[in-house]
Amino acid sequence: MKPVVVFVLGGPGAGKGTQCARIVEKYGYTHLSAGDLLRDERKRPGSQYGELIENYIKEGEIVPVEITISLLKRAMDQTMAANSQKNKFLIDGFPRNEDNLQGWNKTMDGKADVSFVLFFDCDNEICIGRCLERGKSSGRSDDNRESLEKRIHTYLQSTRPIIDLYERMGKVRRVDASKSVDEVFEKVVQIFDKEG
């Protein structure tokens, strides 16, 4: 069985992680966060990628696509090996740019089906406010204003064009993410109920 993938995109602080947790609970998807996989790999003793990942994340830059895809593929393979019924994945925070998308198409062509792109659309200032709030407790090294400005700049420059590209293919399901968590999830449920 091939993995079925929903790409989850949106700026920093759009609520991707929060909403993904709820989708997992309600629809039985497996949530893979590209960022979390990279952060975990960075901490893994003896990782061949650790230091490299650290430098990219600190600079607010996008990690080379080969690394991210190999981590995503490994996670999907492990999940499906453990339970063959679990073939539905939410991939959050990927693809971030054209290079990511080309890398995915090249590596995963015929190996995974992308059913749609879930896009959490949120005003930048709201996103920054949420991240700064989260930074007080998350301990994430990139939840500070300087890193955030860089991340939002990278997102607007690199990720928005990817969303536009999928939009033209009719694959984007857009959600207004500036509303409350419950209101946003209500809209998400409508989308998943319709898409099956």
UniProtKB/Swiss-Prot annotation:
Gene3D superfamilies in the record: P-loop containing nucleotide triphosphate hydrolases
Domain comment (free text): Consists of three domains, a large central CORE domain and two small peripheral domains, NMPbind and LID, which undergo movements during catalysis. The LID domain closes over the site of phosphoryl transfer upon ATP binding. Assembling and dissambling the active center during each catalytic cycle provides an effective means to prevent ATP hydrolysis.
Subcellular location: Nucleus; Cytoplasm
Chain positions covered by the region annotation LID: 133-143
Subunit structure and binding partners: Monomer.
Gene that encodes it: CMPK
Protein name as catalogued: UMP-CMP kinase
UniProt-annotated binding residues for CMP: N100
GO biological process, one term: UDP biosynthetic process
Region spans: NMP: 33-63
Enzyme class: transferase
GO cellular component labels: cytoplasm; nucleus
Superkingdom assignment: Eukaryota
Binding site for ATP: G13, A14, G15, K16, G17, T18, R134, K179
EC number(s) recorded for this UniProt protein: 2.7.4.14, 2.7.4.6
Cofactor(s) the protein needs: Mg(2+)
Gene Ontology molecular function: (d)CMP kinase activity; ATP binding; CMP kinase activity; dCMP kinase activity; nucleoside diphosphate kinase activity; UMP kinase activity
Keywords: ATP-binding, Cytoplasm, Kinase, Nucleotide-binding, Nucleus, Pyrimidine biosynthesis, Transferase
Family recorded in the similarity comment: Belongs to the adenylate kinase family. UMP-CMP kinase subfamily.
Principal subcellular localization: nucleus
Cofactor note: Binds 1 Mg(2+) ion per monomer.
InterPro entries, sorted: Adenylat/UMP-CMP_kin, Adenylat_kinase_CS, P-loop_NTPase, UMP_CMP_kinase
Residues at which a ribonucleoside 5'-phosphate binds: R39, E61, I62, V63, G93, F94, P95, R96, R140, R151
Species in which this protein is naturally found: Gallus gallus (Chicken)
Reaction it catalyzes: CMP + ATP = CDP + ADP; dCMP + ATP = dCDP + ADP; UMP + ATP = UDP + ADP; a 2'-deoxyribonucleoside 5'-diphosphate + ATP = a 2'-deoxyribonucleoside 5'-triphosphate + ADP
Keyword Repeat attributed: no
